[in-house]
Amino acid sequence: MKIVVMSGGLSPERNVSLSSGSMICQALRERGHRVALVDLFFGMEGRGVSHPEELFDAPIPEQFKTVSPQAPDLAEVKRSRQDQSASQFGPGVLELCAMADCVFLAMHGTCGEDGRVQATFDMLGIPYTGAGYLSSALALDKDMTKQLVAGRPGVTTPRWETVDCAAEDLDAILTRTALPVVVKPLASGSSIGVYIANTQEELRSALEHSRAIGGRTVLEQFVKGREFSIAVLEGEALPSIEIIPKAGFYDYANKYQAGATEEVCPADIPAQWEQRMATSAKEVFRTLGLSVYSRADYIITPDGTPYFLEINTLPGMTPTSLVPQEAAAVGIGYGELCERIIHASLEARKKGE
């Protein structure tokens, strides 16, 4: 097959996405596919080619291969684009994608998971991997996701409130918020901008940071327990993975700094706990209208109750990322997983999903 792997983009998670993209590209090439790797935002800039077709044979650039433990400076990223266009699509990107049998979306965060790229491709008739535009948009919005799944069979969620830090009085929010509380941007991943506030001072600092980056913020009940992630692949749950940070919680630095977190897969938990979490994850998947694959995050309390936190429609896809680890636990190798995602996605697009 002729495949474009799309990564990067103008997202706080672009570095993670670039790394996912490079690994997917390499794995698919090793399985005999013609694969072009492209950064959504920069397109053909700096790739040393004169026509998009040449990217199918181009080497993988070094800057795609590593994940910085620091989130990127997006203002600097924007300034470094030569054409200074306001378009999210870099030069030659759409022309390149139109040449492919499928576009593998290795995007993460608002640029790629919010449904806009999917809607564009639907309009242009370009097949792509993962969920469709509407379910992608719903899943990225933490408040909308919680509203839709709270109370569904088998799904338990922490209490939450969504506030607009840019418009509301911070003192009023401080007064009514019970501590400890988890502070999350409404639409982001990789735990960027996530804080656990144990004091009024910590909460104020977190809210001020949220105000600076956009405003709409989810305040979520802090649930004490063990942290897990569980993937759904083609409607069926994979074995869960327990996440054990060596310090703090599973934030951006702990996710992408080597040795900062222990990950145990399959998770060493009672079968009943595993079944409850799998049932919940599949119900969330169905309720949001997702297709192909996803990864959901949970806290399980000491009594075995799984609390659903959020879901990722385009989870990290390096060989050591959570979903590939879970797939490997049932004998699905990394390259095979990438191919299964492509074939399932092509079927989903045919069905209009």
Annotate each language-model stretch with its function:
Residues G109, S191, K246, N312-E326:
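Glycine-rich phosphate/pyrophosphate-binding beta-alpha loops
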